[in-house]
């Protein structure tokens, strides 16, 4: 006997509901992710490439590097890694207008002309982090002495010790994206901009740089600022992992770091690597040859040309303090960044260096919240972190990172220079961030 129509309809409806439920689970799992890369930094190993050991899903992967002979970037196993950012034109209200051709920023994805050099454009050229519904979650597990660490990078929150601090906005919300500048900051109509074909801003104090960045905000919104510490640490960790080395200049390129002058910097124009893809560098370093600029994750001059002022970390009377988010969800007790350290968290470390409070970085100090420069004695241009640390021993120092056009081998991703907020010079500038 045939089933009653109403029973057959009920059965069909139940089966369809089950199919829909399974599809929904698959979609959730796809968004949730399943990748956990890892690496360990061995503080006792002076060779910067031997100091990094792959863990978890990174085991067996081939490191990336710039081939200085062919002029091509060798991706190794990392070209399709989930954390790769995407170049875009970002409206001043924080929404994406359109994406750029990653191999030619003068074009949109569809091949038509972009606004990357248009100073009348109401927005900026930025890298969008967080793709395909997957954010970047990082967990830092310090060694017992806090001088080494295991670092894990995942496309989902594996446990509560994985954090996505760079994705937190001024309202304390965890969002899908955060944005970093493609170019060094330029000053156009009193706004700090990220556009191609521009001269870099110079001789501004930290407060002035922040005010120029915030001039991009629409109405009462608080999305735009200068570089942020938690962004920089995540990006530096990704660079260490991809290159399987702490020596970023050797892996990715020297940058514009040798024999620079104010005149050379003044003549530099952003956008020299618009057609060089996501990564590019040379092993020359001459600041007067602008095509020596380094490019990582689609961004020009992550080091070189100018020191880049960074918010979220300070040295206060010799001790490092920090803040990973605009709000207080990171455990800090003050909203917004400041130049006093009030409401910031203690990193638990006071840097040591030569009699001049400087030197090549030998040791970083790791906590679950970040990585902080510790020892600037015993390092060199080819050992440990291969980059420089300078700090003031009293008062408040605001970090400037990366190195400038006259830094030479001391420049790189691990370079930190803590200087008074009032400091201003031709070799120091800032770049935009947006959350």
Where are these regions (language model features)?
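N-terminal low-complexity, intrinsically disordered "leader/linker" segments enriched in small/polar
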Residues: 2-33
């Amino acid at each position: 006997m045939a089933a009653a129509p109403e029973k057959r309809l009920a059965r069909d409806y139940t089966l369809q509901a089950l199919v829909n439920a399974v599809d929904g689970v698959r979609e959730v799992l796809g968004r949730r992710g399943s990748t956990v890369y890892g690496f360990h930094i061995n503080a006792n190993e002076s060779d910067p490439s031997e100091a990094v050991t792959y863990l978890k899903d990174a085991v067996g992967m081939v490191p990336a590097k710039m081939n200085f002979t062919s002029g091509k970037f060798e991706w190794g196993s990392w070209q399709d890694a989930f954390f790769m950012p995407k170049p875009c034109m970002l409206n001043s209200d924080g929404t994406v207008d359109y994406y750029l051709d990653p191999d030619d920023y003068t074009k949109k994805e569809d091949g038509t002309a972009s606004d990357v050099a248009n100073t009348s454009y109401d927005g900026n050229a930025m890298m969008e982090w967080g793709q395909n519904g997957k954010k970047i979650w990082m967990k830092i597990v310090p060694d017992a002495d806090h001088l080494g660490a295991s670092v894990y990078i995942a496309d989902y929150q594996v446990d509560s010790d994985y954090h996505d601090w760079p994705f937190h906005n001024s309202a304390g919300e965890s969002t899908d994206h955060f944005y970093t500048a493609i170019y060094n900051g330029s000053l156009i109509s009193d706004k700090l901009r990220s556009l191609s074909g521009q001269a870099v801003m110079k001789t501004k104090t930290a407060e002035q740089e922040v005010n120029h960045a915030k001039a991009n905000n629409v109405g009462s919104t608080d999305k735009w600022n200068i570089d942020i510490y938690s962004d920089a640490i995540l990006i530096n960790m990704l660079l260490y992992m991809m290159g399987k080395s702490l020596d970023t200049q050797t892996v990715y390129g020297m940058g514009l770091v040798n024999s620079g002058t104010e005149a050379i910097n003044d003549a530099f124009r952003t956008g020299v690597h618009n057609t060089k893809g996501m990564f590019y560098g040379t092993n020359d370093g001459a600041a007067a040859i602008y095509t020596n600029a380094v490019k990582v994750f689609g961004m020009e001059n992550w080091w070189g040309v100018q020191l880049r002022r960074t918010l979220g970390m300070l040295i206060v009377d010799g001790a490092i303090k920090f803040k990973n988010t605009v709000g207080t969800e990171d455990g800090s007790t003050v909203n917004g960044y400041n130049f006093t350290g009030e409401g910031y968290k203690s990193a638990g470390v006071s840097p040591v260096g030569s009699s001049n409070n400087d030197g090549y970085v030998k040791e970083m100090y790791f906590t679950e919240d970040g990585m902080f420069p510790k020892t600037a004695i015993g390092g060199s241009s080819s050992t440990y972190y291969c980059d420089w640390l300078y700090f003031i021993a009293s008062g408040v120092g605001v970090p400037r990172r990366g190195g400038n056009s006259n830094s030479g081998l001391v420049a790189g991703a691990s370079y930190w220079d803590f200087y008074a907020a009032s400091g201003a010079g031709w070799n120091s500038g800032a770049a935009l961030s947006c959350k």
